[in-house]
UniProtKB/Swiss-Prot annotation:
Main location (coarse class): mitochondrion
Organism in which the protein naturally occurs: Eremothecium gossypii (strain ATCC 10895 / CBS 109.51 / FGSC 9923 / NRRL Y-1056) (Yeast)
GO MF entries: cytochrome-b5 reductase activity, acting on NAD(P)H; NADH dehydrogenase activity
CDD domains given in the database record: cyt_b5_reduct_like
Protein name per UniProt: NADH-cytochrome b5 reductase 2
Length: 306
């Protein structure tokens, strides 16, 4: 097991690695590294931030500020909030609903989890994979910078409280990484949260590993708290990680026991969910845990499905 770092030492490292500002909340926001690259000194002030999404059901048309190609079928979209003093208003773990109206007047709505810091001012980022035949992703990938997309929310998934578990395991595949990364990033960068985090992340090839740089930066920055294990079906080049799929034997050897103060969070495409935990019955009904995790003795008391 990874050695447990103390709350005081983590807080000290956090303080040494950031620039002092007037309010502790903005000190926390300033420490985010890569995910806050679009912020500048004028974005982090003593002025209270305005929340964009308050759960009032209102749709907000937001401009695409930047589009970056992440892989052959995935892009990172940066959206501008109403002003540089606005934050999303999201908490961990929560998502937004995105909408577009078809030429025939019907609404196409999809949920997306931002990968940028919840405290980032003036912007938020989504990492989105294009799916053949996907109505929303096809529309989105046809847009350009300065085009707009409508959003509303937040949609609360799991309400995270610091130190609610001694450790958690995040199991994901493909774009299922986004809510898992949101949790990992939030926990690791919070100086008062000592929760151990182990990410198990499966993909077809090393090139398909989304947010790889950000994941490895967190693991490097917090080696006593964050561990990342990749699983790749078709390893290439200098890839260092597990080969093939996440196996039952690996889980048996590496997961905390069902009775421990820990929790497992799972997110991925339907076949991945079917294999390990079973899919949700509905957005509000987690259903029973099935698949490999059930075979290992885990129940809905130990597992959450995004």
């Amino acid at each position: 097991m990874l050695s447990r770092i103390t709350r005081s030492s983590k807080a000290l490292n956090f303080a040494l690695g950031t620039t002092a500002v007037a309010a502790a909340g903005y000190l926390y926001a300033q420490s985010r590294g890569n995910l806050s690259t679009s912020l500048n000194k004028g974005d982090v002030t003593g002025q209270a931030a305005a929340q964009t999404f308050t759960g009032d059901g209102q749709w907000h048309a937001l401009k695409i500020a930047k589009i970056e190609q992440v892989s052959h079928d995935t892009r990172r979209f940066t959206f501008a909030l109403p002003s540089q003093d606005h934050v999303t208003g999201l908490t961990t773990a929560s998502a937004l609903l995105a909408k577009y109206v078809t030429p025939k007047g019907s609404n196409v709505i999809r949920p997306y989890t931002p990968v940028s810091d919840n405290m980032a001012r003036g912007m938020f980022q989504l990492v989105i994979k294009h799916y053949d035949g996907g109505k929303f992703t096809t529309h989105l990938f046809g847009l350009k910078e300065n085009d707009t997309v409508e959003f509303k929310g937040p949609i609360q998934k799991w309400r995270w409280d610091p130190n609610m578990f001694d450790s958690i395991v995040l199991m994901g595949a493909g774009t299922g990484i986004t809510p898992l990364f949101q949790m990992m990033h939030h926990i690791a960068e919070n100086p008062t949260d000592n929760t151990k985090v182990h990410l198990l992340y499966g993909n077809k090839t090393p090139q398909d590993i989304l947010l790889r740089k950000e994941l490895e930066e967190l693991a490097s920055k917090y080696p006593d708290q964050v561990k990342v294990t990749y699983f790749v079906d078709k390893p290439e080049g200098d890839y260092k990680g597990e080969k093939g799929f996440i196996t039952k034997d690996f889980l048996k050897q590496n997961l905390p026991t069902p009775g421990s103060n820990s929790h497992i969070f799972v997110c991925g495409p339907p076949p991945f969910m079917d294999a390990f935990s079973g899919n949700k019955v509905s957005p509000s009904d987690q259903g029973q845990v099935t698949g490999v995790l059930s075979e290992l003795g885990y129940t809905k008391d130990h597992v959450y499905k995004f």
